[in-house]
Amino acid sequence: MTLYDRALKLMFLLPPERIHGIISGALQTLHLATPVNRVMEKAVRVHDPVLRQTVFGVDFPAPLGLAAGFDKNAEAIDSWGAIGFGYAEMGTVTPKSQPGNPTPRLFRLPEDKAILNRMGFNNKGALVVADNLRARRSRDVVGINIGKNKTSEDAVADYRATSTLLGQLADYLVVNVSSPNTPGLRDLQAVEELRPILEVVKKSTTTPVLVKIAPDLSDEDIDAVADLAVELELAGIVATNTTISRSGLKTPASKVEKMGAGGISGAPLENRSLEVLKRLHERVGDKLVLVSVGGISTPEQAWERITAGASLLQGYTPFIYGGLGWIRGIHRGIAAQIKAHGLDSIEQAVGSGLEWKAL
């Protein structure tokens, strides 16, 4: 058992949202301590040129990034690169601040190495996030995940407002229409609803725009979103968000039922997230950048996503269960596979179908 595993057992004695607050507070302190940041970055981050790539015009030093949902307000923005991530996605950010859903709204499923959440886009609003983005000192790659306010009746206007304000301050934007925790949001994944949103975001910014989809979409709907993304010349697709499915869980059904509604993230998404990635890659090839997220717990799983067509990876729940060692392990594992296959860079591995080599 590692030191982090021991710490995790102690942390799990506290409510999940309390732990999130403690970790966020520590990272915000690191964010403010520039000298410590630099020492951490040198000691923890995997600096290997084979991991570097240029994706939609942005230079990524490494492929694994923090998924949206952890740093909703970009309050620890300068700390994510220091602890090893190649980039970080802030948000989800809405035009106006909102409290999200009532607590408790965050639950652990340790038997599944998963989390169930129904946070509901709790955030301080686009203006606060814009100020935090302007104040950042690092030049690490930062994406912004944007959504609509819960009470808004004009989704297009919400996405326009946030993309106009934040687009110029980010390296890329992600249109989130796939969270299960805002009533009616997932309905916006239907092409007739999604088209005007993506069109207005594209017109509002010159920053690369991606769309994030749910794992629960039918294959036909996945194809339709992919085709629309190609037609509108989006930069890419992030696949996938949390799932509303409860199948295949090790946690007793009665316990999960008591937790209530919400999306599940972590290990249970592994198979479906990979299926969606493969379908997208078959559909769009290299016309779009694919960002894979959901159930990437090991270096071997990360390599499988890269060779199945993902240029970039993301994680949130595995970071909670694995800590800094998870980030470092993923990057070291990918770098070792690139070299073992005689490749010069990660770009040559993307979509290659190369299998994992035991080293």
Swiss-Prot record:
InterPro entries: Aldolase_TIM (IPR013785), DHO_dehydrogenase (IPR050074), Dihydroorotate_DH_2 (IPR005719), Dihydroorotate_DH_cat (IPR005720), Dihydroorotate_DH_CS (IPR001295). GO terms for molecular function: dihydroorotate dehydrogenase (quinone) activity. GO terms for biological process: 'de novo' pyrimidine nucleobase biosynthetic process; 'de novo' UMP biosynthetic process. Belongs to the dihydroorotate dehydrogenase family. Type 2 subfamily. This is Dihydroorotate dehydrogenase (quinone). CDD domains: DHOD_2_like (cd04738). One of its GO terms (cellular component) is plasma membrane. Pathway: Pyrimidine metabolism; UMP biosynthesis via de novo pathway; orotate from (S)-dihydroorotate (quinone route): step 1/1. Catalyzes the conversion of dihydroorotate to orotate with quinone as electron acceptor. It is found in: Cell membrane. It is a peripheral membrane protein. Its main location: membrane. Monomer. The active site is at residue 179. FMN binds at residues 68-72, 92, 145, 176, 212, 240, 266, 295, 316-317. Its EC number is 1.3.5.2. Keywords: Cell membrane, Flavoprotein, FMN, Membrane, Oxidoreductase, Plasmid, Pyrimidine biosynthesis. It is an enzyme of class 1 (oxidoreductase). The gene is pyrD. It catalyses: (S)-dihydroorotate + a quinone = orotate + a quinol. HAMAP family: DHO_dh_type2 (MF_00225). Its cofactor is FMN. It comes from the Bacteria.
